[in-house]
């Protein structure tokens, strides 16, 4: 499967948090998040390993007991089962990759962005 990013097809999942799944395979899935300043992803955990890359903006991340700010160009890895949260300090755009692929995020695919 191949995909192309566009400005359409994002869906709201929480106030100030929009998501679109860009591409997926058998073992991984990549989503793009648009994050509005002042919004937050509450503390949660899941069985997926999650790696992220911040394209723009600033976040305050908590991964387990580790707390730090993320700026454009920063990346992170969240082990499966570890509690984490994010506070959006400035409007931000992030890419997140999940392994194994999150079946619950397949609904965030935009059919118009799929190239084959």
What spans do the regions from the language model cover?
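A short, N-terminal "cap"/entry segment at the start of jelly-roll beta-barrel domains
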Residues: 1-27, 110-116
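Conserved short histidine dyad/triad with adjacent acidic residue
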Residues: 31-45
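Structural motif
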Residues: 58-60, 67, 83, 93
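Short acidic-glycine-tyrosine-enriched beta hairpin
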Residues: 65-80
């Amino acid at each position: 499967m191949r995909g192309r990013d566009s400005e359409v097809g994002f869906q709201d999942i929480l106030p100030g948090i929009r998501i679109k799944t860009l591409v997926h395979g058998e073992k991984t899935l990549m989503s793009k998040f648009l994050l509005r300043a002042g919004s937050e992803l509450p503390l949660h955990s899941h069985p997926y390993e999650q790696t992220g890359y911040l394209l723009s903006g600033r976040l305050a991340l908590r991964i387990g007991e580790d707390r730090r700010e993320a700026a454009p160009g920063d990346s992170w890895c969240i082990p499966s089962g570890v509690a984490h949260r994010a506070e959006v300090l400035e409007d931000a755009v992030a890419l997140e990759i999940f392994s194994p692929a999150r079946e619950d995020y397949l609904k965030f695919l935009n059919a118009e962005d799929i190239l084959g």
